[in-house]
């Protein structure tokens, strides 16, 4: 089979034998690709450093029976170094990469919108012009949109009644009206849902004037919604330092599990986003 080229983000890698690595790539035209990079662990490797996680590359691959083989790599962006040099940026970017791999799904199923979104989000985290926690939540919301899981934030998720609506239920699909509200719904302040809508729409002017409490509660809802659809916990999300989010997500899961009949108020968030 012929060689092929594509643009890719390096999602992760692990050792293979004494000198090789297997790399997971989110490519623009070929979706999720796993490939062997031969000899990259040797000090004289031609492109070992270019295949580190977060790298945005132009890669040439040779199709293989089980795994493709990396034959050439050129760096496109140099934002990986800015990410790994700061712990906060690093943890946010790790959560993005794990989410991208989960949403990409099957290998070789092209999702060009997810590739573009991931590159733009990593670049935004690296340059630091916007709060990295907001960039992460915007990425998670839009990635869910790519997958078809975006939460309803204005109209009712069940009957499409015009909103805004105060109640929010993860399993129901987001905001729900008073007639459709299931037991276990939470009632965040309207500013929390407004913030989530601003992040999804790219309205940074309004997103960046949000309060720390609203940011904390919004991140809890975003994380709970994403992990409910993935049907698994993301290993990297707990590493992101955002006070209050874990408590919010835990309370939401408990409300859903116990089927509380009364509306539940979100707990007050700790100071700081």
From Swiss-Prot:
InterPro entries: ARFGAP/RecO, DNA_rep/recomb_RecO_N, NA-bd_OB-fold, RecO, RecO_C. It comes from the Bacteria. It holds the Pfam family RecO_C. GO terms for cellular component: bacterial nucleoid. One of its GO terms (biological process) is DNA recombination. Keywords: DNA damage, DNA recombination, DNA repair. PANTHER family: DNA REPAIR PROTEIN RECO. Involved in DNA repair and RecF pathway recombination. Belongs to the RecO family. This is DNA repair protein RecO. It comes from Mycolicibacterium gilvum (strain PYR-GCK). The gene is recO.
């Amino acid at each position: 089979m012929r060689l092929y080229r594509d643009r890719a983000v390096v999602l992760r890698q692990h050792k293979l034998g004494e000198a090789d690595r297997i790399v997971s790539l989110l490519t623009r035209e070929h979706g999720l690709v796993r490939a062997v990079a031969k000899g990259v662990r040797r000090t004289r490797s031609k492109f070992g450093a270019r295949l580190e996680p977060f790298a945005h590359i132009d890669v040439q691959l040779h199709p293989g029976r089980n795994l493709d083989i990396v034959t050439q790599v050129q760096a496109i962006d140099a934002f990986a170094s800015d990410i790994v040099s700061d712990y906060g940026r690093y943890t946010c970017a790790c959560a993005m990469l794990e989410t991208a791999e989960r949403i990409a799904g099957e290998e070789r199923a092209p999702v060009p919108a997810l590739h573009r979104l991931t590159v733009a989000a990593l670049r935004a985290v690296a340059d630091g012009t916007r709060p990295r926690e907001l960039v992460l939540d915007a990425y998670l919301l839009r990635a869910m949109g790519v997958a078809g899981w975006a939460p309803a934030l204005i109209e009712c998720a069940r009957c499409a009644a015009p909103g805004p609506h105060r109640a929010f239920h993860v399993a129901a699909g987001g905001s729900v009206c008073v007639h459709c509200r299931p037991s276990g719904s939470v009632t965040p302040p309207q500013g929390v849902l407004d913030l989530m809508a601003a992040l999804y729409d790219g309205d940074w002017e309004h997103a960046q004037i949000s309060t720390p409490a609203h940011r904390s509660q919004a991140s809890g809802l975003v994380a709970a919604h994403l992990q409910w659809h993935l049907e698994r916990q993301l290993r990297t999300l707990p590493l992101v330092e955002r006070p209050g989010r874990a408590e919010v997500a835990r309370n939401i899961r408990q409300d859903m599990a116990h089927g509380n009949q009364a509306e539940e108020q979100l707990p007050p968030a700790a100071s700081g986003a």
